Amino acid sequence: MHSFKHERRRISSKLADATLTTGGSPEGIDYSPVAMMPDVRVLKIGGQSVMDRGRAAVFPILDEVVAAKDKHKLLLCCGGGTRARHIYSIASDLELPTGVLAALGGYVPRQNARMLQMLLAKHGGLFIMNDDFEKLPLYFRLGCIPIMTGMPPFGYWEKPTKGGRIPENRTDAGVFLTAE
């Protein structure tokens, strides 16, 4: 039998010996976020405030988006609206956990984003998933109007909400995080 002596390799890093669970930045780490795409305008198309109102509300907004698309880089994010609230109500009544509600509620804003993509297809409307976010510079160079769900991608891993099951992080939070 061979006897091997294994030495633990050490990688020099400011975070190597830091605890990352206490919050804040470890000493000596400066944090200054880089604005990845500062010229992009993120617009939320609300589920209840716009999509649920149908053609009379949606079409004038899309006309404005099309008129602005050549002047600005626009990323559209969609809310869920009444249908998402209905899903939350049923799933809560069935006593499903918060993560399941987040996953189920995320389907509705995705449906809304797909509808907008179809309506904007002739103008470069393009449905994208959260994982396509890194491709935004390419889509903008091609003259596209990227459209995505406003729901953050936590899904089943959404933290339980104090005093209820409705996910705290819904489309308003997702659009904010996207814009950040």
Task: Explain the meaning of each model-derived region.
Residues 1-75:
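N-terminal glycine-/serine-/threonine-rich phosphate-binding loop
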